[in-house]
């Protein structure tokens, strides 16, 4: 039949149609030749199929196979007149294009989800939550998390993933450090913060500027108070030496008040109940009226030992003497203090009272019947002045030791 239709040559081979695009509207016959071993013995055969009309003007191809070409069993020849090639599909093995196959493509897709961006986010969250951490700590936690999530991975693949995770964590830390989100000092990693916009950054800088200016003011107040203390102490020492030279003898023991001390001032009509401990280091006062507490520095200022620097009423002669009582590096500060009133002295002693503080009896009713004071030579004293300069601590200690020795002798 094929020979009568002109499809077979005289030598028995199939004739190839060369000019098939004469009329795109005509139906085209496609022939598929299959190896005899693949033909069903029950009599089912592959018959030529006639395709419908095609509206696309594309050259139609005829898929031809020869009976002499070997073909494996369970293999289908897939061809189409619209495709220029033919390929064989096996029925025993699933196609690699299946999204459910556990091949390289699927595993590669899983690893693509653990890229640098993914690990940067994870590392950023870890460091932000901890505040201060290290590379090993972050890497170990992430390895533990991903290893627990991927239990089906083989041991050799798990080791590879752990190395990959640690490398990604290292890269992510470098990226975050380059963006100034974290800082690294030796092995310690600290969280700085996420980048902000210009307006917010400007606002944060302004807040930081105000905070630092406030700290500078506090430090200036501390420095001024320390300068006043040094001037008052040195001026007192010079006055005592001058008095001893004039009297040609030391002052009587009962007329000496050792530093530090406090003075309690109240009305003559106030009833005072005073209790003293056995070691004479603690005194308990009960007042039925208002009273004032003054520390030693306040008393020295009222005596004029600060040369008027605390009130800005320093004369040229007092300024010259005050400048001679301080180190040369502090002389400009003394000049500035003399030009204006020193105000807002910053007090750092915990539980202290300001100079010349006034109390009332009602202020002492919250869980206490009175006030507790310490002896002038006691170490438990807490006054409002800043710490005594170092150059005078030794003298005070020596005087206190002598005083204690005299008490023991008595």
From Swiss-Prot:
Q: Which GO terms describe its biological process?
A: anoikis; epidermis development; negative regulation of fat cell proliferation; positive regulation of DNA-binding transcription factor activity; positive regulation of G1/S transition of mitotic cell cycle; positive regulation of transcription by RNA polymerase II; regulation of DNA biosynthetic process; regulation of DNA-templated transcription
Keyword Transit peptide attributed: no
User: What's the name of its gene?
Assistant: TFDP1
Q: Where is this region: DCB1?
A: 214-246
Induction record = Down-regulated during differentiation.
Region named DCB2: 259-315
Name the domain of life this protein comes from.
Eukaryota
From the UniProt annotation, which stretches of this protein bind DNA? 113-195
Source species = Homo sapiens (Human)
The protein here is known as Transcription factor Dp-1
N6-acetyllysine modification sites are 3
CDD domains the UniProt entry points to: DP_DD (cd14458)
Single Gene Ontology MF annotation: DNA-binding transcription factor activity, RNA polymerase II-specific
Assembly, per entry = Component of the E2F:DP transcription factor complex. Forms heterodimers with E2F family members. The complex can interact with hypophosphorylated retinoblastoma protein RB1 and related proteins (RBL1 and RBL2) that inhibit the E2F transactivation domain. This repression involves recruitment of histone deacetylase (HDAC). During the cell cycle, from mid-to-late G1 phase, RB family members become phosphorylated, detach from the DRTF1/E2F complex to render E2F transcriptionally active.
Record keywords: Acetylation, Activator, Cell cycle, Cytoplasm, DNA-binding, Nucleus, Phosphoprotein, Transcription, Transcription regulation, Ubl conjugation
Gene Ontology CC annotations of this record: chromatin; cytoplasm; cytosol; nucleoplasm; nucleus; Rb-E2F complex; RNA polymerase II transcription regulator complex
Q: Which family does it belong to?
A: Belongs to the E2F/DP family.
A Pfam family name for this chain? E2F_TDP
């Amino acid at each position: 039949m094929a020979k009568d239709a002109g499809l077979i040559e005289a030598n028995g081979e199939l004739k190839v149609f060369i000019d098939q695009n004469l009329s795109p509207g005509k139906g085209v016959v496609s022939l598929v030749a299959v190896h005899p071993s693949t033909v069903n013995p029950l009599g089912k055969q592959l018959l030529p199929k006639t395709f419908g009309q095609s509206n696309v003007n594309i050259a139609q191809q005829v898929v031809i196979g020869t009976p002499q070409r070997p073909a494996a069993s369970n293999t289908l020849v897939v061809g189409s007149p619209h495709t220029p090639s033919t390929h064989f599909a096996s029925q025993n093995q699933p196609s690699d294009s299946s999204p459910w196959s556990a091949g390289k493509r699927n595993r590669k897709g899983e690893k693509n989800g653990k890229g640098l961006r993914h690990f940067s986010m994870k590392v950023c969250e870890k460091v932000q939550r901890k505040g201060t951490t290290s590379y090993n700590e972050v890497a170990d936690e992430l390895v533990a998390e991903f290893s627990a999530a991927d239990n089906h991975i083989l041991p050799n693949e798990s080791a590879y993933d752990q190395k990959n995770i640690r490398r990604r964590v290292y890269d992510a830390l470098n990226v975050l450090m380059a963006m100034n989100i974290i800082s690294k000092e030796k092995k310690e990693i600290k969280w700085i913060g996420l980048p902000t916009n210009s307006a917010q950054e400007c606002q944060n800088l302004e807040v930081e500027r105000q905070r630092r200016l406030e700290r500078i003011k506090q430090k200036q107040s501390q420095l001024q108070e320390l300068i006043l203390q040094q001037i008052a102490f040195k001026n007192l020492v010079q006055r005592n030496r001058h008095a001893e030279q004039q009297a040609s003898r030391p002052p009587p023991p009962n007329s000496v008040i050792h530093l530090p001390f406090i003075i309690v001032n109240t009305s003559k009509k106030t009833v005072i109940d005073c209790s003293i401990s056995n070691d004479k280091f603690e005194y308990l006062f009960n007042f039925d009226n208002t009273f004032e507490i003054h520390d030693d520095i306040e008393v020295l200022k009222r005596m004029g030992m600060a040369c008027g620097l605390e009130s800005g009423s320093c004369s040229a002669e007092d300024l010259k003497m005050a400048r001679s009582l301080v180190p040369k590096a502090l002389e400009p500060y003394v000049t500035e203090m003399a030009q204006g009133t020193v105000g807002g002295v910053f007090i750092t002693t915990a539980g202290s009272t300001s100079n010349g503080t006034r109390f009332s009896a009602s202020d002492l009713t919250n869980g206490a019947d009175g006030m507790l004071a310490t002896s002038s030579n006691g170490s438990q004293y807490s006054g409002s002045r800043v710490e005594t300069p170092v150059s005078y601590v030794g003298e005070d200690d020596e005087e206190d030791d002598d005083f204690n020795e005299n008490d023991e002798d008595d």
